Swiss-Prot record:
Role, per record: Binds directly to 23S rRNA. The L1 stalk is quite mobile in the ribosome, and is involved in E site tRNA release. Protein L1 is also a translational repressor protein, it controls the translation of the L11 operon by binding to its mRNA.
Keyword Zinc on entry: no
One Gene Ontology cellular component: large ribosomal subunit
Gene3D superfamilies: 3.30.190.20, 3.40.50.790
Quaternary structure annotation from Swiss-Prot or TrEMBL: Part of the 50S ribosomal subunit.
UniProt-recorded name of the protein: Large ribosomal subunit protein uL1
CDD domains: Ribosomal_L1 (cd00403)
Organism of provenance: Mycoplasma pneumoniae (strain ATCC 29342 / M129 / Subtype 1) (Mycoplasmoides pneumoniae)
Family matches, as Pfam families: Ribosomal_L1
Keywords, comma-separated and alphabetical: Repressor, Ribonucleoprotein, Ribosomal protein, RNA-binding, rRNA-binding, Translation regulation, tRNA-binding
InterPro entries: Ribosom_uL1_bac-type (IPR005878), Ribosomal_uL1 (IPR002143), Ribosomal_uL1-like (IPR023674), Ribosomal_uL1/biogenesis (IPR028364), Ribosomal_uL1_3-a/b-sand (IPR016095), Ribosomal_uL1_CS (IPR023673)
One of the record's GO molecular function terms: structural constituent of ribosome
C-alpha cells in the first residue's frame, strides 16, 4: 500500500471514519480536506440495493442540477437541422459525415445528441461508443425529436447518471470552490431523483450508503437526509 503524503495524513486525521455526517457538515469538511493545488471536483457516490442483472433495476437517466457542476462539455449534435443545433450551443454538428468521422477514430467530444433517424447508423458503432459511454439513449434524452432543446439543457448543466453493475451511482456535484449551499442543493436534487426512481421490485433498504470525496482527499460517509 502506498504511503500517505503528509498533507493527506493531516486531511484524513480531520475525518471521523465512524461518523455519518449530516450533508451540510460533510460538504464543508470535504472542501476543507481537499489537498490538490488545483480546483478539484467534489464527488458523490450513492450505493443502492439494486440487482442490475434485472432490466427494471438498471437505473439510468439525466438530471438538471440546480447549479453548475463546473466543467463544460463538448456536444456533438447529429441532426439534419445543423443551424438550429449550432445556435443552441452544440460544439460540433453534422449528419452521416460526423458518423463517418467517428468510425475513423474521431472522438473529441463528450456527448452525442441526435434524432431517432440517425440511430441505425450510430448503432453500427455500438462497440466503440458503448464502451466509452458515448452511445445516445432515449432514457438520457440524448435521442430526441428536439435536438436543439436537448443541447440547451445539457449546456445549462444537465448530466447523465447511471448505476454501475454494483448498483453505485458516481457523480460530480461541483468544484471545491463552489458555494457550499450549491453543492448541498445539487446533492439533494440527485438524492430526490434517485428516491423517485426506486424500482417497484426493490425490497428493503434502497439507499445503502452515501459518500462524499474530492479529486484528492479523504472520503466521508453521509447521513441520508430526511
Amino acid at each position: 500500500m502506498a504511503k500517505l503524503s503528509k498533507k493527506m495524513k493531516i486531511a484524513v486525521g480531520l475525518v471521523d471514519k465512524t461518523k455519518l455526517y449530516p450533508l451540510q457538515e460533510a460538504v464543508d469538511l470535504v472542501k476543507k480536506t481537499s489537498i490538490t493545488k488545483f480546483n478539484g471536483s467534489v464527488d458523490i457516490a450513492v450505493s443502492l440495493n439494486l440487482d442490475t442483472t434485472k432490466a427494471e433495476q438498471q437505473l439510468r437517466g439525466a438530471i438538471a442540477f440546480p447549479h453548475s457542476v463546473g466543467k463544460p462539455i463538448r456536444i456533438l449534435a447529429i441532426t439534419d437541422d445543423e443551424k438550429a443545433a449550432l445556435e443552441a450551443g452544440a460544439d460540433f454538428v453534422g449528419g452521416i459525415d460526423k458518423i463517418n468521422d467517428i468510425k475513423n477514430g474521431w472522438l473529441d467530444f463528450d456527448l452525442i445528441i441526435t434524432s431517432p433517424k440517425f440511430m441505425a447508423a450510430l448503432g453500427k458503432l455500438g462497440k466503440l461508443l458503448g464502451t466509452k459511454g458515448l452511445m445516445p439513449n432515449p432514457k438520457t434524452e440524448t435521442v430526441t425529436d428536439d435536438v436543439p432543446a436537448a443541447v440547451r439543457a445539457y449546456k445549462k448543466g444537465k448530466k447523465e447518471y447511471r448505476a454501475d453493475s454494483f448498483g453505485n451511482i458516481h457523480m460530480s456535484l461541483g468544484r471545491v470552490d463552489s458555494a457550499s449551499n450549491h453543492l448541498v442543493e445539487n446533492a439533494l436534487a440527485l438524492l430526490d431523483l434517485i428516491k423517485s426512481r426506486k424500482p417497484a421490485t426493490v425490497k428493503g433498504i434502497y439507499i445503502k450508503n452515501i459518500a462524499l470525496t474530492t479529486t484528492m482527499g479523504p472520503s466521508l460517509k453521509v447521513k441520508l437526509p430526511d
